[in-house]
Each structure stands twice: as C-alpha cells, then as structure tokens.
Amino acid sequence: MSGNTLGSLFRVTNFGESHGPAIGCVVDGCPPGLPLDAADIQRELDRRRPGTSRHVTQRQEADQVEILSGVYEGVTTGTPIGLLIRNIDARSKDYSNIADTFRPGHADYSYWKKFGQRDPRGGGRSSARLTAPTVAAGAIAKKWLAQQHGTIVRGYMSQLGPIEIPFVSWDEVPNNPFYAPNAAIVPELEAYMDALRRDGDSIGARIEVVAEHLPAGWGEPIYDRLDADIAHAMMGLNAVKGVSIGAGFGSITQRGSEHGDEITPDGFLSNHAGGVLGGISTGQPVTVSLAIKPTSSIRVERRSVNRAGEPVNVQTLGRHDPCVGIRATPIAEALLALVLIDHALRHRGQCG
C-alpha cells in the first residue's frame, strides 16, 4: 500500500531520506547460491555516485555499501539481503530558505498535500538520492541474470536537451561522464552544460536501456505484462516523464507493413516491438527509452506559494544536478534488471 516495494518474487523495499543517517533497501527473494560480495554492488554504485564530474551535483558521497544480511561466506543464502548506504555529506542548512515554500516542478507540494508534512532537507523521501539503493539491488539482479541466462543490461544517453547523440559504439559509453556512445560529441555536451550551470538553470535528457540475450517467454499477461511492469518501474525513477518500448511513439507514423516485425527461420528481421509482444518477451533485445525532465531545484528565481498559500519567489541554493539524466543511465539499467529477474523467477515458478 505504501509504494516502497518493487517486484513480486524478487522484492526490493527501499527506505531512507536524502539527509537522514542512511538509506538502503531489503532484497527479499534472491535465489540462494549466488556468489556475491560488496565489490559486486560497489561497482554499480560508483557509476551512479555524485560528485564525479563538474556536470553533476558536488555532494560528496562515497556511497559505500554495507551488506547486513542474506550473504554468508560470499554466497547468498536465500534469506533477505539488507543493504545500507550511510549519508556523510548532507548540508541541511542549504534548505532553510525553502522549508516553508514549494519549488515549482518539485514534489514538495504534492508530498505536503498527501501527508500534511514534509522533510524539506534535500527533498527528503522524494530525492534522487534514494536511487542509490535501487542501483545496489539492481547489481544483484544483473549478476544473477548474467550467470543464469547470459542476459546483459546496459544503457546510454541519446539526447541532452536539444543535442541529439548519434550512437557510435558501446565502447564509448563508460569513457565520459554523460554515458554518451559517441566520443566526438562530448565537447559539445560539456560546453552546453557549462553554459547551463552559469545560467543557474537545468535541462532534461533521453536515456536508452537495452537488455540482450534473454529468452522468450518472460511476462505475465494480461495485467502483469513485461512491458507494463517495465514502464511501471521506470516511472518510479525520479524525473521520468515518459517511457516508450521499442518504436514507442514512432509507431504512430508506421504502417502495419513496416511496424510488424517479420519472422524468418533465422529469426526476426526487425525489432519495432522492442522485444515484447503481448506482454511476453520474444527473445529479441528489450529496448526502453526514457524522457527525463529538467531538475526543479534551480537558481533561477520563480513564482510559487508558501504553506500559508501566500505568493513567494523561490530560488534554490545548495548542490543539485543541473541534469539528472547524466546519472540516470545506471539507475535505469538497475530498474530494468529488477523487472527482468522478477519475471524470470515468476516464469520459472509457473512454467519450470
């Protein structure tokens, strides 16, 4: 009911606030016997960690994961896995000027309307800081999927604001702070972000996530379709305002003779469906595209109201991502992996 848990058989319950003592999650339903240590999880967390370039928030968090339970002698036991990440660089005083006001475009207003109170420090529960436990859980899912099925989940940025990023090579993705698959365009991205930071403003982005080498048959129609659960999970990522599978909204202009992926004895001739038909995986790569909105915490002064309903001008100080999409790629990968492992286990339970 509370909305803090993702999954049916592989369940992840997320907890914590941006400026609390710690954040973390409990992973319940991980199969026993998976080799796992903190380094497996830390590799993924380091890809998402803040303060790694001038283009992201300068909050300095080590994001060191602690495995509290569910692993013995380097192997999962099948019991709940507790993961903890301590907050070490919170600056709550940066938010004193907005404690009683609502940032335009932020969850400040809706959280207050729902709960009648809110934690203004760093956005509290609505902060993107809470994606770190998601990435930690996703690291476990990624490892199991790779070992059991050879499934690879990876992503990249395909657009930053008005700048489209042509895909060149997966090899380029880990070599720049944008997760851009094109080294030649990185200087343009850097110049754009430098100008944006000087303006005190923010921008959105588009992220692509792909899962390859998964079998056909995953997905539970009609209400737990694979693509429906993917969209559900992705919309749980802060700042996501749009999710498409395969050709997505491009399907509108395609004729059926183009959109329907023809099949030969050697396999499919295209993948407009994005690897999912009727809510079930086809064995083709699952392709997902995300639209990330601009960060709402900006230095540009904007109009809003306070808790008394009085008009105010809001300017957000502190340390914030001018484009949350820059660090969104490993988070989106984690969410896709979490959905896939859940459906893999559900399929195994029903169909063997």
UniProtKB/Swiss-Prot annotation:
FMN binds at R125, S126, S127, N238, A239, G278, K293, P294, T295, S296, S297, R319. One of its GO terms (cellular component) is cytosol. Homotetramer. This is Chorismate synthase. Its cofactor is FMNH2. CDD domains: Chorismate_synthase (cd07304). It comes from Bordetella avium (strain 197N). One of its GO terms (molecular function) is chorismate synthase activity. It is an enzyme of class 4 (lyase). It comes from the Bacteria. Pfam families: Chorismate_synt (PF01264). The keyword ATP-binding does not apply. Keywords: Amino-acid biosynthesis, Aromatic amino acid biosynthesis, FAD, Flavoprotein, FMN, Lyase, NADP. Reduced FMN (FMNH(2)). This reaction introduces a second double bond into the aromatic ring system.
